């Protein structure tokens, strides 16, 4: 990360407009956009933190504010997480669906052009963004959102829950998220893992720094390869010497690559 490498996580973000999509304290979104009433191309951002309540949407407010200055309407999703009532399985995942569906009712009020949208998620939020577009339609599967983006950007996403379980990432956080191991909760892993539901069927870019020591780059090399073989339009961008947080730091050298991938509003 640039300058003080913890600044994104510790500095309050520029304010946004808070809109609730449910009754729980964490069921809300933060909307930031340039002044004016015109409908703008919309970026939906899902934050990471390995699904734990210690991390919230505040730290992605910096990148959302930066993109708003560049002409985007941005929406940072908050959701119930491990450690909160209703968090973990299935509430963490169903909150993302509920938040995305709620945006259809907020679009006119805030000038959100959902027909020209991108979804972007970082780390565990990358998992949730990928999950939302790869939802199974099998009977009994978790509810999928009612609309899809034009483009999906995964920033060092946790793209394979079974692999995350095998590697015991972040003190074996998948046990907390899914209530057991992949062997013990096979159906939940199958329903919740993007890698189990390829192809994505949306243009996708995965950005993963070569110095990331939080989510293994090998996981996304494999995921992108499998998605491409399944017929997806997907590519992997690997910024040299970038760590796990450089990709969400608007002061980092890597940020220009993220902006370029998103394109012009």
Predicted regions and their residues:
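Catalytic nucleophile-loop/oxyanion-hole region of alpha/beta-hydrolase
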Residues: 55-64, 75-116
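Short beta-strand/loop motif that positions the catalytic acidic residue
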Residues: 200, 206-208, 212
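Primarily recognizes the serine-hydrolase "nucleophile elbow" in alpha/beta-hydrolase
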Residues: 101-167
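Short, surface-exposed "cap/lid" segments of acyl-processing enzymes
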Residues: 35-39, 43-66
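Mobile cap/lid helix-loop segments that gate and shape the active-site cleft of serine hydrolases
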Residues: 8, 163-196
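N-terminal cap/lid segment of alpha/beta-hydrolase-fold proteins
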Residues: 1-37
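C-terminal catalytic histidine-bearing segment of alpha/beta-hydrolase fold enzymes
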Residues: 214, 221-265
């Amino acid at each position: 990360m640039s300058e003080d490498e913890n600044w994104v996580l510790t500095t309050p973000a520029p304010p946004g407009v808070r809109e609730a999509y449910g009754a729980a304290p964490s069921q809300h979104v933060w909307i930031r956009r340039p002044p004016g009433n015109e409908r703008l191309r919309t970026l939906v951002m899902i934050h990471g933190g390995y699904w734990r309540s210690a991390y919230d949407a505040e730290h992605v407010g910096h990148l959302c504010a930066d993109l708003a200055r560049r002409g985007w309407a941005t929406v940072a999703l908050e959701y119930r997480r491990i450690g909160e009532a209703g968090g973990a399985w299935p509430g963490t995942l169903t909150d993302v669906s509920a938040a995305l569906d709620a945006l259809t009712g907020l679009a006119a009020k805030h000038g959100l052009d959902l027909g020209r949208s991108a979804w972007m998620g970082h780390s565990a939020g990358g998992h949730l963004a990928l999950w939302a577009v790869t939802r199974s339609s099998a009977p009994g599967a978790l509810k999928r959102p009612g609309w899809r983006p034009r483009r999906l950007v995964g920033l060092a996403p946790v793209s394979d829950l079974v692999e995350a379980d095998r590697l015991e990432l972040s003190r074996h956080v998948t046990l907390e998220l899914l209530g057991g191991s992949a062997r013990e909760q096979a159906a939940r892993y199958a329903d919740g893992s993007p890698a189990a539901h390829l192809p994505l069927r949306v243009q996708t870019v995965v950005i993963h720094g070569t110095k990331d020591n939080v989510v293994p780059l090998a996981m996304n090399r494999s995921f992108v390869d499998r998605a491409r073989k399944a017929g997806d339009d997907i590519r992997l961008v690997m910024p040299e010497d970038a760590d796990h947080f450089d990709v969400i730091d608007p002061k980092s050298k890597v940020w220009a690559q993220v902006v370029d991938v998103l394109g012009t509003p």
